[in-house]
Amino acid sequence: MISPDRIKEIANSKPTGIFNATGGAELGVTAASATAITVDEIMDLFYSLKSPYRKNAIFVMNDATVKAIRKLKDGNGQYLWQPSISAGQPDTILNRPVKTSAYVPTIAAGAKSIAFGDFGYYWVADRQGRSFQRLNELFAATGQVGFKASQRVDGKLILAEAIKVLQQKA
């Protein structure tokens, strides 16, 4: 499972983000509106993902998108959003977990506002071990010692069909 601190890398183009036009996730559905999402579009996104990937799939979106979706109801007047009733369990949409990240684009014209899929197919690889450098002189005047650390990582969605995105109308 992808940790929340990796979402920023995954959502954006560092290294190869899921919302990138090249190397990113496949388009699952285009919303009819530039500023809203419907229950039908979420259903279409859900079923645009092939069945084998739905088993481990999660929804990833921005808090503002979550707010909009929490207001949606199905044809029977039931809210699509199902808050978790168990401590430590995530909220769900269509019985799939929902994760939020400030790094996923909000609902706006042309934005890819929701990702749904099996994020196990996004691989993050450590390119080399961490390196640490002790900085004795930098803080010598205050009697402190500083440290500088670096690590090289790379990531890529290795199977584009494992994650689908919902894109707002341009």
Residue ranges and their predicted role:
Residues 3, 13, 24, 33, ...:
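Generic serine detector
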Residues 15-17, 64-67, 105:
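Short, catalytically relevant binding-site loops at active-site mouths
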Residues 20-28, 63-65, 109-115, 129-131:
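Generic detector of short, locally flexible boundary/turn motifs and exposed helical patches
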